[in-house]
């Protein structure tokens, strides 16, 4: 038989098999657009604005639908009811971490953010317990954050009211808090190694939100065979991990099991106590990836939120004025802010919540995965299926937040000006995979922002109406545009 004819017949059979398989799977899964072989529904998604693509598809197929990202079926949950029903009401089933190939390759299934099964359960339980032992939610952590807020204010004073890009100054403060928790140390804001570390973190954040990375996560083979920014991501990730591995080696040499100093010490002590088959057993690589997860999550997300908060306060000076008036009334000029103040500052609390709602930092959450077969809203979702939960659709729900595209602290105030909570507020996700550092993040946002506004007036370089608050990138995260401002001592 003609070899060319054999090749054509083989390819035709593979094509038909692919169509049949997708048709069979689609018959069980929630409805969705018809996928093309190999590439799936990728042409129906704008990689520069995935959120809008998901919203458009939800209008056609409802709040629970299936997309094929490449050949892999992915269930998308859109809107508060669907997200809450999955992550809270069926929390155990939806607690798996879906595949994110760029992180799968970097972490090799270890750490706290991208692991699954017993590795994830043991690591998360240990991490939460250790963070509590180190003072999470207690006065000792608050003291650390307050001290770092003081250092941040002093560093901002050194700008002498001149225009500056706040990116790295705002990154130093949360990074130092994480450093103090992980290896009981902090850095001077001008330390070259420290700034290099922050540059790597900032670059990671930007790379993860590029359209190219979204394509790579859909077609993982590109990670191994194509040039691109993903290679820089792996270099930066390895740099941070190796930096932390060196800290781990130093801790191993100076460890006193009777007096654990920090997260690394607690992990080393725990690892020595466990059985050989336990995931925490003397595993430096696992420890390094765990603290790298905490490092990236605790530094870059907070730095980005603080940066975006200042941009919004520049854009809306009437909001800034109200916050500063409340600071003056409750705290005054000479006492440093503390967490007890928050309950007496409803407008400031509302402003911080509105910043997090409006910037929509991780629009589509990190992917989840169902840990067993489940019948969800009369649809069958088989074990191992990746699930995307659109946090953007929750944070921008017009029924809960009128005019959701408008920045308005009133979204979190009642008719009497008192702060009001909302079940729809889930920037940290919700359920079993909710951010482990949520409490610390809330504390940092309040203490850092109130400390800045207590000591400085924010001066933009252009008229507020000309300030662009459109994200520079929207991918895994939302990245604010670059800007400069002046910190004028008040």
From Swiss-Prot:
The gene is Cyp2c54. Its EC number is 1.14.14.1. The keyword Endoplasmic reticulum applies. The keyword Disulfide bond does not apply. Induction: P450 can be induced to high levels in liver and other tissues by various foreign compounds, including drugs, pesticides, and carcinogens. GO terms for molecular function: arachidonate epoxygenase activity; heme binding; iron ion binding; linoleic acid epoxygenase activity; oxidoreductase activity, acting on paired donors, with incorporation or reduction of molecular oxygen, reduced flavin or flavoprotein as one donor, and incorporation of one atom of oxygen. Pfam families: p450 (PF00067). One of its GO terms (cellular component) is endoplasmic reticulum membrane. The modification N6-acetyllysine is found at residues 252, 375. It comes from Mus musculus (Mouse). Heme binds at residue 435. This is Cytochrome P450 2C54. Metabolizes arachidonic acid mainly to 12-hydroxyeicosatetraenoic acid (HETE). It catalyses: an organic molecule + reduced [NADPH--hemoprotein reductase] + O2 = an alcohol + oxidized [NADPH--hemoprotein reductase] + H2O + H(+). The modification Phosphoserine is found at residue 127. GO terms for biological process: arachidonate metabolic process; linoleic acid metabolic process. It is a peripheral membrane protein. Keywords: Acetylation, Endoplasmic reticulum, Heme, Iron, Membrane, Metal-binding, Microsome, Monooxygenase, Oxidoreductase, Phosphoprotein. PROSITE patterns: CYTOCHROME_P450. It is found in: Endoplasmic reticulum membrane; Microsome membrane.
């Amino acid at each position: 038989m003609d070899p060319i004819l054999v090749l054509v017949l083989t390819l035709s059979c593979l094509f038909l098999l692919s169509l049949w398989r997708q048709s069979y799977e689609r018959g069980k899964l929630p409805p969705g657009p018809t996928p093309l072989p190999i590439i799936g529904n990728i042409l129906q998604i704008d990689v520069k604005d995935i959120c809008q693509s998901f919203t458009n598809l939800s209008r056609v197929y409802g709040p629970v639908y299936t997309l094929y990202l490449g050949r892999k079926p992915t269930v998308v949950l859109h809107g508060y009811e669907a997200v809450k029903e999955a992550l809270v009401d069926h929390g155990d089933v939806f607690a798996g971490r879906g595949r994110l190939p760029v992180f799968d390759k970097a972490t090799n299934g270890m750490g706290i953010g991208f692991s699954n099964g017993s590795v994830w359960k043991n690591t998360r339980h240990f991490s939460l317990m250790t963070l509590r032992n180190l003072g999470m939610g207690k006065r000792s952590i608050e003291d650390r954050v307050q001290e770092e807020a003081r250092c941040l204010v002093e560093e901002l004073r050194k700008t002498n009211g001149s225009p500056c890009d706040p990116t790295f100054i705002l990154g130093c403060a949360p990074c130092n808090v994480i450093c103090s928790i992980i290896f009981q140390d902090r850095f001077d804001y001008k330390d070259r190694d420290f700034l290099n570390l922050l540059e790597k973190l900032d670059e990671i954040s930007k790379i993860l939100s590029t359209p190219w990375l979204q394509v790579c996560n859909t077609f993982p083979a590109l990670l191994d065979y194509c040039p691109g920014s993903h290679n820089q991501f792996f270099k930066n990730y390895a740099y941070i991990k190796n930096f932390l591995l060196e800290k781990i080696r130093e801790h191993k040499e100076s460890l006193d099991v009777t007096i654990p100093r920090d997260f690394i010490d607690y992990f080393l002590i725990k690892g020595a106590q466990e059985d050989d088959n336990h995931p925490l057993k003397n595993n430096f690589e696992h420890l390094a990836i765990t603290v790298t997860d905490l490092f990236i999550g605790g530094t870059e997300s907070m730095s980005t939120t603080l940066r975006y908060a200042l941009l919004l306060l520049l854009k809306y000076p009437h909001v800034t004025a109200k916050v500063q008036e409340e600071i003056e009334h409750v705290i005054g000029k000479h006492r440093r802010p503390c967490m007890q103040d928050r309950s007496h500052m409803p407008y400031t609390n509302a402003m911080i919540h509105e910043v997090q709602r409006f910037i929509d930092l991780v629009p589509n959450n990190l992917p989840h995965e169902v840990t067993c077969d489940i019948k969800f809203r009369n649809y069958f979702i088989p074990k191992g299926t990746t699930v995307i939960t659109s946090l953007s659709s929750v944070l921008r729900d017009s029924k809960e937040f009128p005019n959701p595209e408008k920045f308005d602290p009133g979204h979190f105030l009642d008719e009497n000006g008192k702060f009001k909570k909302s079940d729809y507020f889930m920037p940290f996700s919700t359920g079993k995979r909710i951010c482990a550092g949520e409490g610390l993040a809330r504390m940092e946002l309040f203490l850092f922002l109130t400390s800045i506004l207590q000591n400085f007036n924010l001066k933009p370089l252009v008229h507020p109406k000309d300030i662009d608050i459109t994200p520079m990138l929207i991918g895994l995260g939302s990245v604010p545009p670059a800007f400069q401002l002046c910190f004028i001592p008040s």
